[in-house]
From Swiss-Prot:
This is Cadmium resistance transcriptional regulatory protein CadC. Residues 58-77 bind DNA. The keyword Kinase does not apply. Metal-binding repressor for the cad operon. Involved in resistance to heavy metals, such as cadmium, bismuth, zinc or lead. Metal binding causes the repressor to dissociate from the DNA. GO terms for molecular function: DNA binding; DNA-binding transcription factor activity; metal ion binding. One of its GO terms (biological process) is response to cadmium ion. Cd(2+) binds at C6, C10, C57, C59. Homodimer. Keywords: Cadmium, Cadmium resistance, DNA-binding, Metal-binding, Plasmid, Transcription, Transcription regulation, Transposable element. NCBIfam families: HTH_metalloreg. Residues 23-118 form the HTH arsR-type domain.
Length: 119
C-alpha cells in the first residue's frame, strides 16, 4: 500500500521561504473569492458568454446556458451581488455585462489559463 504523505519531516527552508515571499504579493483572497463565485458550471458559462459578447439580455443568456430564465436570473443576481456583473434595463429587456475591465481581465486570465486542462 502506497502512502501519499511524507514518512519523515524534512523542510527545505529556502523553498518554503521563496513560496511564502511570493504569496505575499499574490491576491490570494481575491483569487479565492473568484474561484468560489465560478464554482458553479452555469455561472462559468454565463461569465464566458459575457466575455465573448460584452452585453447580453437575460433571454439570450438563458438560451446559451440551457437553463430557464428564472434560474439564469438567479445566477445573474448572484454575480451582480458579488460585483462581477452589472445590468441595465432597456424597455422590457434587461441586459447584463461584466462589471468593469478589472473584473473582465481577471476572469479572462483565469478562464484562459484553464483551457484544455483536464481535471
Amino acid at each position: 500500500m502506497t502512502v501519499d504523505i511524507c514518512e519523515i519531516t524534512c523542510i527545505d527552508e529556502e523553498k518554503v521561504k521563496r513560496v511564502k515571499t511570493g504569496l505575499e504579493t499574490v491576491e490570494v483572497t481575491t483569487i479565492s473569492q473568484i474561484f468560489k463565485i465560478l464554482s458553479d458550471e452555469t455561472r462559468v458559462k454565463i461569465v464566458y458568454a459575457l466575455l465573448t459578447e460584452n452585453e447580453l439580455c437575460v433571454c439570450d443568456l438563458a438560451n446559451i446556458v440551457e437553463a430557464t430564465v428564472a434560474a439564469t436570473s438567479h445566477h445573474l443576481r448572484f454575480l451582480k451581488k458579488q460585483g462581477i456583473a452589472n445590468y441595465r434595463k432597456d424597455g422590457k429587456l434587461v441586459y447584463y455585462s461584466l462589471a468593469n475591465e478589472r473584473v473582465r481581465d481577471r476572469i479572462k486570465l483565469i478562464l484562459l489559463n484553464f483551457e484544455g486542462v483536464g481535471v
